[in-house]
Structure formats: structure tokens, C-alpha cells
Amino acid sequence: MTLTAAIVLAAGEGTRMRSRKPKVLHEFAGKTFLNRVMDAVGALDPETLAVVVRYQAQRVAEAARSYDDAVLIVEQDEIPGTGRAVQCAMEQLGEQGPLSGTVLITASDMPLLDTSTLKQLLDYHRDSGDGATVLTTVLDDPTGYGRIIRDADGNVLKIVEQKDGNSSELAVREVNTSVYVFDAAVLEQAIANLNADNAQGEFYLTDALTVARQVSKVGAFAAPDPLSVEGVNDRVQLASLAKAHNLRVCRQWMLDGVTIVDPQTTWIEDEVEMESDAVILPGCFLQGHTTIAHDAVVGPYTTLIDATVEPEAHVERSRVQESRIGREANIGPWTYLRPGNEIGTGSKAGAFVEMKKAHIGDGSKVPHLSYVGDADLGENTNIGGGTITANYDGVHKNHTHIGSDVHIGAGNLFVAPVNVGDGVTSGAGSVIRHDVPGDAMVYSENTQHVVDNWKPAWER
């Protein structure tokens, strides 16, 4: 079936979120609601993908274009309602020529809407021959949702909104998901006859189904997975849906051979990749394009963002962002790896160590209480506790090079740019301002002064 157009409705404010930003720009498992829905719809390859905006229109439009710069942005005018949003979209789509074929319409506040469900909906619509099809689901508590009212033959009569329903209508548990498929000709007739005769004084898209029924049959397809069409109206619903989704994600990873000790406290975003026999301890957040290899151990209480963890590495109580941790390397506890680090095989970044754009050679160790930024270390080098690479001169970031088989004493300060050759040993408390040749000893003579019988001024 050719999908002529897909219309994503993203014009609403989402007042129940109590937020300064539009509801569709809130995030779910690492992506905005809007981009997640556009992912699902875009995979259907519609001839035109349109996004309707109104509240903070420019901000929402920019987010939509960040997904696909070819997206058609439709700005809804001051007339409220989802029906009016579709009218605006159809007017703009019509400027490209007469519409034929099939039009998909979806809300943008269903972060788990998936391409598979949409394909099944389109197939059902094609096979049924109906002029319009609504995607539905059955809820234990349908409060707040539009109810699907059917006739004796099971055909859809209408959709009744919560504020407009009587007691028998509100007792219905089958609800509208705000996803529809129309034949283009049926949709054009239906939206041309909408009115605002309802409690909200808005143009409801749901009324288009009542109008459509006058010229064609209206069918309904029940989503096989209710979670995939669950909408988010407030932060309570957001947290509930996020937890349910995350537990599913954790369960699937466990079935795939990953050990997750406590799924209740482990959060894994959708684009994370892991190999079997990886171990995730409690309290971990795995985000972005993070990859974790077999036999690596992550946690407890660790955050990985776009990080790569190679086999048999161990990352404990640390935060790692845009960095690669080599095979059998040890990170933590309480290590902060900012973007751009490469930690070599069997290397270590220990307690209270911060690194940024550091390349640590195989077998090298930065055990504790150090800052290593804009620096590279060779192999089998040991950095004493309390060492700092002073990389910033107030204007530029400068580089420090420390070679292989180097032994740096405690409390060293490297004033970049500076190069230290292979096999160097430095004394404790040294300030290294100039290059040091290989196989040398370097130390700073800081004279120690002792004042006998000293008393502070207030005791004299």
C-alpha cells in the first residue's frame, strides 16, 4: 500500500506536564516523544511526512527538522483542535497537487508507538476496504480517553470524548489511540464538515469518523500491544510508562544472555548494545550509543553515556561519557571520564580521578586523586596520587605527553605543553615546566623551612 502522507500532530501544549517546553519535546529513553513517533512513522516511507505545530511552533519545528530536514512543517492557525490541525495539514498537502491513496494521522505523545503496529494497521485498512480505520486499545481504566462506540455489527459509530460522554458511553473500555488511517478522498470530505459543537469548543478529529461513516465504512484495529499506544499526559504517566518499558528492555537483555542483577534499578536506553555474559550490577544508567562487551562488569552505581566497554573491563561507581575503556581495564570507584578518553588494555583510572581527552597506554595506571586532561601516557606508566596536568593557559588547551615505563611521584604538576620521555622517574611534589629526556630523574627543589616555637598571631 502506498502511503501518500503521514501527518504527525504536534501542536499541543500539554498543560498537564506543567512544563515550560512543549510536551512532545520531553524525553523518553533518550529521545523526545516527537522524534520517537517520527522514527516509527518515517520507517513506513511516506511520500510526505508532515508535522503540525502551534505551541512554541519554531522550537517544535526545529526538533522535527533535526530528524528529517525534508519534513513538511504545517503551522496550525488560532482555531483550536485536532480536527483543525488536520485541516491545515490537508490544505498544505493539497498545494502539492490532488491527494489520492492513503493518509496516516497520529498524535505525537505515544513514545512507544512502533512501526510494526502501524504496518499492521495499514494492512488491516487495505484488506478491510474501509474508508477510515482507527487504531484502538482496551484499558482497565479508560478515564480521559475517547471511547469507541460501535453498532450491533461491530462497526465504529463514533468516538465520544470524556467530557461529552454519557454514563453508558463512558463505561466502554475500548478507547481511541489517536492514530487513524483514511483514504485521502474520504478524509477530505470528512474534515470539510467538522464543527465545534462540543464541550471544549474545538474541532475534534474524532468527529471526522462520524462524518466519514456517511460516505464509507469505518473500521477499527486493536493494537496487539497496549503499551505501544499508551499516551503520556503528565509526569506520573511518563514515569509509569518509562518503568514498564525499561523492565521490558531489561528482560529482553537477560533473555539474550546479559546478567542484570537488579532490573528495578538498572536503566537501559534503546540504542545501547551489549554482548552475552556482560554483567550489569545495581544502580546503573546505560545511555546513548553505549556498547558493552562480553565478560565486562559495569557497576554498581555507574552511568555510561555513548561509552565503549571492552571485554573483561570493570567500571565501578563512575561516570563515563564518549570514552573507550579497553580490555581488562579497571575504572573507579568514583572516576569521572569526560569525553574523548582512550583507556588501554589492562590500564586503570582509580578513585577520584578525572580525565578528559586522555589516551592511556596499555598497562598504565592513574590510581587516585588526579586530573589528566589533554594528555597521552605510554605503556606501563604509573602516575602518583594527586597529580595534575595543567592544560589551560587561559586561552588555549595545551598537551602533555608522558612516555612509557615512567614513574611519576605523588603530587606532581605538569605545566603544559610539556613532553616527558620514556623511562623517566619524577620526585614527589615536582612541578614539571620543561621537557624531560628519556631515562632521566626529574625533581623540583622546594626548600623546606622550619620556624621553631611558632605561635599564630592571635596567641602572641
UniProtKB/Swiss-Prot annotation:
Class of the enzyme per the UniProt entry, highest EC level: transferase
Gene name of the record: glmU
Molecular function (Gene Ontology), one example: glucosamine-1-phosphate N-acetyltransferase activity
Organism: Bifidobacterium animalis subsp. lactis (strain AD011)
HAMAP family reported for this sequence: GlmU
Entry's EC annotation: 2.7.7.23, 2.3.1.157
Pfam family, one: NTP_transf_3
Listed name of the protein: Bifunctional protein GlmU
Subcellular location(s) per record: Cytoplasm
Similarity comment: In the N-terminal section; belongs to the N-acetylglucosamine-1-phosphate uridyltransferase family. In the C-terminal section; belongs to the transferase hexapeptide repeat family.
Keyword Acyltransferase listed: yes
Complexes and interactors: Homotrimer.
Alphabetical list of InterPro entries matching this protein: Bifunctional_GlmU (IPR005882), GlmU-like (IPR050065), GlmU_C_LbH (IPR038009), MobA-like_NTP_Trfase (IPR025877), Nucleotide-diphossugar_trans (IPR029044), Trimer_LpxA-like_sf (IPR011004)
Region (Linker): 236-256
Annotated region described as N-acetyltransferase, given as residue ranges: 257-460
Active-site residues, as the UniProt record annotates them: H368
Residues that, per the record, bind Mg(2+): D109, N233
Binding site for UDP-N-acetyl-alpha-D-glucosamine: 9-12, 23, 76, 81-82, 146, 161, 176, 233, 338, 356, 371, 382
UniProt pathway annotation: Nucleotide-sugar biosynthesis; UDP-N-acetyl-alpha-D-glucosamine biosynthesis; N-acetyl-alpha-D-glucosamine 1-phosphate from alpha-D-glucosamine 6-phosphate (route II): step 2/2; Nucleotide-sugar biosynthesis; UDP-N-acetyl-alpha-D-glucosamine biosynthesis; UDP-N-acetyl-alpha-D-glucosamine from N-acetyl-alpha-D-glucosamine 1-phosphate: step 1/1; Bacterial outer membrane biogenesis; LPS lipid A biosynthesis
Residue positions binding acetyl-CoA: N391, Y392, A428
Pyrophosphorylase: annotated span: 1-235
Record has Coiled coil as a keyword: no
Purpose of the protein: Catalyzes the last two sequential reactions in the de novo biosynthetic pathway for UDP-N-acetylglucosamine (UDP-GlcNAc). The C-terminal domain catalyzes the transfer of acetyl group from acetyl coenzyme A to glucosamine-1-phosphate (GlcN-1-P) to produce N-acetylglucosamine-1-phosphate (GlcNAc-1-P), which is converted into UDP-GlcNAc by the transfer of uridine 5-monophosphate (from uridine 5-triphosphate), a reaction catalyzed by the N-terminal domain.
Record's keyword terms, sorted: Acyltransferase, Cell shape, Cell wall biogenesis/degradation, Cytoplasm, Magnesium, Metal-binding, Multifunctional enzyme, Nucleotidyltransferase, Peptidoglycan synthesis, Repeat, Transferase
Cofactor note: Binds 1 Mg(2+) ion per subunit.
